[in-house]
């Protein structure tokens, strides 16, 4: 192929041939042609000398695609190799790019036709600026401003460059540049902003050219968030922006600028200017958009520009109110404009656009939190510091003053807050528990996939409704009951109206005092049950059923206190279990489980007016209740009844209830086992296998809820289960041995293996949930050593169940050192054979990988002495497998491997084998961890990489190591100590891995690691900066490097939510639910 000539870069590249190759890649040619072109272009990009041909290519091609290809090559060099280039090459490229931009933007015609190319050149120039400025290109900003004044089109493009520069430094810099470089660029932009400011004012005052004014407003928008406020409030800038606001061509860009100004907050120095700005803005807005206009309707029929205006308006109001609403509150003359602004925002909140609603919702959430916070601290001054993180001391004399101020504030906001309650009730998002939805064709169906965006929105709306309920319980109750009565009367009957209302009712669970909640719920449940009776049609009844189930599932406190309601609700759920409309039975079973888990004690005592506990009555009619349920629904039901039985404190009654619950499955089990004793072939029939599987799954769910009390039931079937396990295992093995790998995918083998897995899962579930009683371990573990472990070792790889590994991990985690003597047997049975399965590549046997390393971690944590007793060959295998684990790109496996490694490092440090272990493995571990830390595929493991390296760097100074880490036979000169050796070794290791970094930079980093070894925060920051400096992590999504900080913030938020009644739903709070 002629294009192969392009690989030869010893002479100027054939641009015509390059054009043809690039076009072949982008064209609709054959797949082979595109693949061939792709290979050549990739090789050219990878070749370190291609960039030297960029100028030649740009000067000789007319193809936009080829120009972009050349600029991509250049961009890579600028990002990763720029500082290694000779000064003359850097200056030459910098001047060439600048000249091309000026040439193309000087002429109106070329500027418009080549706009895409100019935009890409601008990006390249800004990448160069980030490297060169300010140290090596001090005159960049003055040069740009001078060029801007030579022609209006050049000025327009200069504005685009200035916008790009601000975005690169202030918006996209985190994770791409070191903290020091970001700081340097920000200081330079700040110090030279006066020139930019003067240029913008000059253009906005003097130019009549629409494109230039729009480009200037757009650039200004990028700068307003960080420039000193004096440039805004002590110059004509704000006045000019407000002058442009009524002009339709500039309205949206001006509004974006005003939103940026509104989002700034530097104390109260400019408060009066903010009030003046808001006042002028509101007067202008009411002329453009009358307050009585139906904004949602106007939005739905408006142009894209008009819709963008409403979106920007939402951003302006929310930004302004978040920071400056208190200024408007403080002066009576501003109150009417403040209420008008809130009125606009409530009207905008009804717009049928998810993004607009998210913006509004975020503000409403913060406003009601703030109103609730001030009210809460007025009523409970002693509690507030701990609730809201305020360090204040409240004197009795100040509390009354605060209370009266809060009362006035509540009066001011009472009307907007009442309207906001109406908004929230009418737009509540669907909670996760609701399984019944309306599809795009208007049919009521079972939900097939969760929408995470909707769940996040529900969480925020629920929190907002909780605060609104706390601010005025009566108004909340009144609005909800009024809307419910309109559902009953038919005045507002509609699926969506009932759904959002019931979701809102369910969401405020826990926010009312007990007496009010009781009164409220009695009316709600009665009305919903009445609605179910009067409304006809299967779809209608399904919608009402789902709402009844959702509401009752949220109010366990009410149900615990009202037995008759609880019994009525449960009987209603039993009724729904016979309703075959998609989703109703699933939701009925899920709701029953949720209620039982929170009210279980109520079902095992004899209630007033009853002759026996409810659980006994239920067990008598068990077959009828579950008669129409599918197997998976029956399993959920059985788990629920198991929860009830677990609450019974009398062992004799508990045993009797369990016997009655398991009577049907036990009867079927005994029948199958009895037949199998006559002829084992019965166990090979697919229908029998399915029945066995179903029985085992039922047992597993009951074991989940009963824990230790399941002992009598599992003892009854345990040995028979092991026999079934052995028989099915032999069938699977012989099928795979005779039929090859394909046999493992046949329906019969899949079914047999499902039974094996369920047996293992049942045993694991019971042992995990049972209390730590040694006699249980002694009863169940020995029979499994051959039947399960031996079977695993003997089987062909494709027939080995990964659940064996997790079962024995659970056993070791549960019984700890008691299992130490068994570890060699476990090791012998699973280690070597599993390792052979998972180390051929990173893909095969994914389940075995994770569970194998979880088992190793359990052994390392609780039976470490057993690891020490391994031979050096076996220990090497363990260490190799650990390294193999954290090299894995599957996050769970890599994290399990790193946690296991940390566990072993700490344990070996405390052991007698410390010196021997670290002499053998210290350098290998350090090398391997640095390899995964710096390769960008393992970023989620960043926190653990840091902890491993911190351990290693701390270890060399700790005194734990009495022997040298270097090999005296191969190292020509001895080191004074291990610290000196490790620092030098690490510097050499990283210098060879990152040739683009100087030895000084690497040495500085390594010394920084050593100096910060006792401060994990500084240690982590050093590594983050190094990763960015090394260029390996530039232009990547680096949020994983900050994951630990994000997790800590989430925990602080959870603690705050726990302190406010209702914010975490009662159904989500873990408690013992003794129901006394």
Curated annotation (Swiss-Prot):
What's a Gene Ontology MF term here? nuclear export signal receptor activity
Sequence ranges assigned to domain Importin N-terminal in this UniProt record = 37-103
The UniProt entry annotates HEAT repeats at 135-171, 232-267, 282-319, 475-514, 564-601, 613-650, 683-720, 757-794, 799-836, 895-935, 943-988
Membrane topology category: Peripheral membrane protein
Taking the first listed entry, what is the main subcellular location of this protein, grouped into a coarse class?
nucleus
Q: What is the annotated localization of this protein?
A: Nucleus, Nuclear pore complex; Nucleus membrane
Q: What happens when the gene is disrupted?
A: Gametophyte defective when both XPO1A and XPO1B are disrupted. Abnormal pollen germination and tube growth, impaired female gametophyte development and embryo lethal.
Q: Is Magnesium included in the keywords of this UniProt record? A: no
Q: Give expression by tissue.
A: Present in mature pollen grains, unpollinated pistils, and 2-week-old seedlings.
Q: Which GO terms describe its biological process?
A: embryo sac development; mRNA transport; pollen development; pollen germination; pollen tube growth; protein export from nucleus
Which family does the UniProt entry place this protein in?
A: Belongs to the exportin family.
Which named protein is this?
Protein EXPORTIN 1B
The protein's organism comes out as Arabidopsis thaliana
What gene is this protein translated from?
XPO1B
């Amino acid at each position: 192929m002629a294009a192969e000539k392009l690989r030869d870069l010893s002479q100027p590249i054939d641009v015509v041939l390059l054009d043809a190759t690039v076009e072949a890649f982008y064209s609709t040619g054959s797949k082979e042609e595109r693949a061939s072109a792709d290979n050549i272009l990739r090789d050219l990009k990878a070749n370190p000398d291609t960039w030297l041909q960029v100028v030649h290519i740009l000067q000789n091609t007319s193809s936009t695609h080829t120009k972009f290809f050349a600029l991509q090559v250049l961009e890579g060099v600028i990002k990763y190799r720029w500082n290694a280039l000779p000064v003359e090459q850097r200056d030459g490229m910098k001047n060439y790019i600048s000249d091309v931009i000026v040439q193309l933007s000087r002429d109106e015609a070329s500027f418009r036709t080549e706009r895409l190319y100019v935009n890409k050149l601008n990006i390249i120039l800004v990448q160069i600026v980030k490297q060169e400025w300010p140290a090596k290109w001090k005159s960049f900003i003055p040069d740009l401003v001078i060029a801007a004044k030579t022609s209006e089109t050049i000025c327009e493009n200069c504005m685009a460059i200035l916008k790009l520069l601000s975005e690169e430094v202030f918006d996209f810099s985190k994770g791409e540049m070191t903290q020091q470089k970001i700081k340097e660029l920000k200081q330079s932009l700040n110090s030279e902003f006066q020139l930019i400011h003067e240029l913008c004012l000059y253009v906005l005052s003097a130019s009549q050219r629409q494109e230039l004014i729009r480009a200037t407003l757009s650039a200004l928008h990028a700068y307003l968030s960080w420039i000193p406020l004096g440039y805004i409030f002590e110059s004509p800038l704000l006045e000019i922006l407000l002058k442009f606001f009524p002009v339709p061509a500039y309205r949206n860009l001006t509004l974006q600028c005003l939103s940026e100004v509104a989002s700034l907050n530097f104390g109260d120095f400019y408060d009066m200017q903010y009030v003046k700005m808001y006042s002028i803005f509101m007067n202008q807005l009411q002329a453009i958009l009358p307050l009585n206009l139906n904004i949602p309707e106007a939005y739905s029929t408006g142009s894209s520009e008009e819709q963008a205006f409403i979106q920007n308006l939402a951003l302006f109001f929310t930004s302004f109110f978040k920071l400056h609403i208190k200024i408007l509150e403080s002066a009576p003359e501003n109150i009417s404009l403040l209420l008008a602004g809130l009125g606009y925002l409530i009207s905008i909140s009804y717009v049928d656009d998810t993004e607009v609603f998210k913006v509004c919702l975020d503000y409403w959430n913060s406003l009601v939190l703030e109103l609730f916070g001030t009210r809460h601290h007025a009523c409970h001054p002693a509690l507030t510091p701990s609730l809201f993180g305020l360090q204040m001391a409240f004197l009795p004399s100040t509390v009354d003053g605060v209370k009266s101020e809060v009362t006035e504030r509540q009066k001011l906001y009472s009307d907007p807050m009442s309207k906001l309650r109406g908004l929230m009730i009418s737009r509540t998002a669907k909670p996760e528990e609701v399984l019944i939805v309306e599809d795009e064709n208007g049919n009521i169906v079972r939900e097939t996939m969760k929408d995470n965006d909707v769940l996040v929105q529900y969480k925020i709306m629920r929190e907002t409704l909780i605060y609104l309920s706390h601010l005025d319980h009566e108004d909340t109750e009144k609005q909800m009951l009024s809307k419910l009565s309109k559902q009953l009367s038919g005045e507002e009957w509609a699926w969506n109206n009932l759904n959002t209302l019931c979701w809102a009712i369910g969401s405020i669970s826990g926010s009312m005092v007990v007496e009010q909640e009781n009164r409220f719920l009695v009316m709600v449940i009665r009305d919903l049950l009445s609605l179910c009776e009067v409304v006809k049609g299967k779809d209608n009844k399904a919608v009402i059923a789902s709402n009844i189930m959702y509401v009752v599932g949220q109010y366990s406190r009410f149900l615990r206190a009202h037995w008759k309601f609880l019994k009525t609700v449960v009987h209603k759920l039993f009724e729904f279990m016979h309703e075959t409309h998609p989703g109703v039975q699933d939701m009925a079973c899920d709701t029953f489980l949720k209620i039982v888990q929170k009210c279980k004690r109520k079902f095992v005592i004899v209630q007033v007016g009853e002759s026996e506990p409810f659980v006994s009555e239920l067990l008598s009619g068990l077959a009828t209740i579950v008669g129409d349920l599918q197997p998976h629904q029956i399993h959920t039901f059985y788990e629920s009844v198991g929860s009830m039985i677990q609450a019974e404190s009398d062992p004799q009654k508990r045993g009797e209830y369990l016997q009655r619950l398991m009577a049907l499955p036990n009867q079927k089990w005994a029948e199958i086992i009895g037949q199998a004793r006559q002829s084992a072939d019965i166990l090979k029939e697919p229908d029998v296998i399915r029945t066995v599987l179903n029985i085992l799954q039922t047992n597993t769910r009951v074991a989940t809820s009963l824990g230790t009390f399941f002992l009598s039931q599992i003892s009854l079937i345990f040995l028979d289960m092991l026999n079934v396990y052995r028989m099915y295992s032999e069938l699977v093995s012989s099928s795979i041995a005779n039929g090859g790998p394909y046999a493992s995918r046949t329906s019969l083998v899949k079914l047999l293996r499902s039974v094996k897995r369920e047996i293992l899962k049942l045993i694991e579930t019971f042992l995990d949930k049972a209390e730590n009683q040694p006699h249980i371990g002694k009863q169940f573990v020995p029979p499994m050593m051959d039947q399960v472990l031996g079977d695993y070792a003997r089987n062909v790889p494709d027939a080995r169940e990964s659940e064996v590994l997790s079962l024995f991990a659970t056993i070791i985690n549960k019984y700890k050192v008691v299992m130490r003597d068994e570890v060699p047997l476990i090791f012998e049975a699973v280690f070597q054979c599993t390792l052979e399965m998972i180390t051929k590549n990173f893909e095969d046997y994914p389940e075995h990988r994770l569970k194998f390393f979880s088992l190793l971690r359990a052994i390392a944590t609780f039976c470490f002495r057993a690891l020490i007793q391994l031979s050096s060959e076996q220990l090497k295998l363990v260490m190799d497998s650990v390294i193999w684990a954290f090299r894995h790109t599957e996050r769970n496996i890599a994290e399990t491997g790193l946690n296991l490694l940390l566990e072993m490092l700490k344990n070996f440090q405390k052991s007698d084998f410390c010196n021997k272990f670290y002499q053998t493995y210290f350098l290998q571990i350090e090398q391997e961890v640095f390899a995964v830390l710096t390769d960008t595929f393992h970023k989620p493991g960043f926190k653990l990489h840091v902890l491993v390296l911190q351990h290693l760097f701390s270890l060399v100074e700790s005194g734990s190591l009495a022997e040298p880490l270097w090999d005296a036979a191969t190292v020509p000169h001895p080191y004074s100590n291990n610290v000196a050796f490790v620092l030098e070794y690490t510097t050499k290791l990283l210098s060879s891995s990152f040739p683009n970094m100087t030895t000084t930079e690497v040495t500085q980093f390594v010394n920084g690691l050593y100096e910060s070894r006792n401060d994990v925060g500084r240690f982590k920051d050093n590594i983050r900066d190094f990763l960015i400096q090394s260029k390996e992590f530039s232009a990547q999504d680096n949020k994983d490097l900050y994951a630990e900080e994000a997790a800590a913030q989430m925990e602080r938020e959870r603690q705050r939510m726990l302190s406010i009644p209702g914010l975490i739903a009662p159904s989500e709070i873990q408690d013992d639910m003794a129901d006394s």
